[in-house]
């Protein structure tokens, strides 16, 4: 299963300006906020979670919330996903791959899910 999402970084900037850090907690946890220092990274994390929801096929819904998947970076700075056990079980997920990129004022993310 593949999911892709793209977002204008300015959209995140505008929402952060309007709502402050309260906005960030709608889709990120404290650790993710500490990792995502720039608005481009925040936008990439948002796109990644949307892409994950699309790969699941259910979108953001009662079956899947933004907080059911977390994004971290490895020692090389590459993003990876930590998926809640209930999501792994409910959707038979064996493995997940994530790629995030930023260019031209946009952030894009692609998620590939491998099912059991």
Task: Name what the model sees in each region.
Residues 1-116:
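Core catalytic alpha/beta fold that binds nucleotide/phospho-ligands
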């Amino acid at each position: 299963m593949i999911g892709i999402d793209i977002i204008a970084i300015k959209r995140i900037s505008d929402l952060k300006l309007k709502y402050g850090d309260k906005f960030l907690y709608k889709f990120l946890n404290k650790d993710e906020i500490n990792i995502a220092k720039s608005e481009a990274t925040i936008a990439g994390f948002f796109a990644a979670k949307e892409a994950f929801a699309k790969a699941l096929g259910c979108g953001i819904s009662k079956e899947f919330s933004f907080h059911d998947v977390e994004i971290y970076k490895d020692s090389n700075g590459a993003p990876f996903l930590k998926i809640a056990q209930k999501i792994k079980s409910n959707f038979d997920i064996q493995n997940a791959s994530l790629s995030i990129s930023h260019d031209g004022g946009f952030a894009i993310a692609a998620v590939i899910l491998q099912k059991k």
